[in-house]
Design a protein with these regions (language model features):
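Active-site-adjacent loops and short helices of periplasmic peptidoglycan-processing enzymes
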Residues: 1-71, 75-84, 88, 148
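Domain-terminus/edge residues, biased toward the C-terminal soluble/receptor-binding domains
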Residues: 50-51, 65-67, 71-304, 312, ...
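Non-catalytic terminal segments and appended small domains
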Residues: 333-335
Length: 342
């Protein structure tokens, strides 16, 4: 208690040595308590598609309400592979923590995953990372990544005895590499599109520019060997336009790849950022709006003046015509003779 470590050092301790106290420390650092962190983890697992996972602690020690499945764990592992910093950590077999405020000596951490250790009889040359786990109740569990010929596989085994977690994982990898291949479905350019970006200001849509949406890389799908790419159906979900600020790397659409009843989703991300309206731009819009309003008022007043002038002229004209008509009628009437008495 009271020792200061970097988050990077703590994560290495968790990955290489399953350090329970380090896991609890991270939980409290991120969410304030182990309970809140466990709830956070469960929510994140659901976002990744996990349907049978519930966490109640940060270290994985046995609890009836703390559980997962091999499939759910593979989904979590797949997400980790998307982040290069974690891929790097998971592939390490040794790490040194230098002296700290409470420890005067360097601590040497050695990984427990024997499939990553070239000196172990269980070494698997295509394995690139993973994590071990053990409790009396759960037995040996193992999550491992392996890569060969562009194909990355994730193997998860649970409740194993002795060294079964290594031998079973190796058997799964051998089967996967022998029977499956990573097939290119589309290039980035095949699903690159540009859409307008707008922002609502003063109840009007203001054009902010355009954003290019595309996959982050060429799209691949793992298929049984010999299966053509045309066997995969692709459904796109691309917006016609985007409202509001866009950050580079933001997910704005998806590709849904389907084969044999299974679906894989590929994110379409923003290739460029689009900024919101600046205060200067808003001021210009306000000025333009005010100028337009003044013009409309001026035009309205001008039209009203013209209408009034027309009404005045028409009224005078009608009055003049009436006067002329009365005058003409008086001229046309016969004059009466008057008799005068003498």
């Amino acid at each position: 208690e009271g020792e200061t470590l970097t988050l990077e050092q703590v994560l290495r301790a968790i990955i290489l040595r399953s350090a329970n106290e380090a896991s609890n420390g991270v939980a409290e650092y991120v969410d304030g308590s182990v309970e809140a962190f466990a709830k956070h983890m469960t929510e994140r697992a659901k976002e990744l598609g996990c349907t049978n996972t519930n966490f109640v602690n940060a270290n994985g020690l046995f609890d009836e309400n703390h559980y997962t499945t091999a499939h759910d764990m593979a989904l979590i592992a797949r997400e980790l592979l998307k982040h290069e910093e974690y891929r790097s950590m998971m592939s390490e077999t040794d790490y040194e923590i230098p002296p700290t405020n409470l420890q005067t000596e360097t601590r040497y951490l050695h990984g427990q995953h024997q499939m990553l250790n070239p000196n172990s009889i269980y070494y698997y040359k295509d394995a690139i990372g993973g994590k071990t786990g053990y409790t009396v109740e759960a037995g040996n569990t193992l999550v491992t990544y392996a890569e060969r010929d562009g194909l990355t596989l994730i193997a998860v085994v649970m409740k194993c005895n002795g060294a079964e977690h290594y031998t079973d994982t190796a058997a799964l990898f051998d089967y996967g590499f022998a029977n499956y291949a990573s097939v290119k479905i589309a290039a980035v350019s095949d699903y690159t599109s540009t859409v307008p970006v707008t922002e609502t200001y003063n109840k009007k849509a203001v054009d902010l520019g355009k954003v290019t949406i595309a996959p982050s890389e060429d799209v691949y799908y793992t298929l049984p060997k010999g299966t053509d790419a045309s066997a995969v159906t692709v459904k796109t979900d691309i917006p016609e336009g985007v409202e509001g600020t866009v950050k580079k790397g933001q997910t704005l659409g998806t590709l849904q790849l389907s084969y044999n009843g299974k679906t894989q989703t590929v994110d379409l991300i923003a290739q460029n950022a689009v900024d919101a309206l600046t205060d200067t731009q808003k001021a210009e819009l306000d000025k333009s709006s005010l100028s337009g309003m003044v013009k409309r008022v001026a035009i309205g007043v001008g039209i009203a003046a013209i209408v009034l002038l027309l009404i005045f002229c028409i009224t005078r004209f009608i009055g003049y015509r009436s006067y002329q008509r009365r005058k003409q009628l008086r001229r046309q009437r016969p004059r009466r003779r008057r008799n005068y008495r003498r």
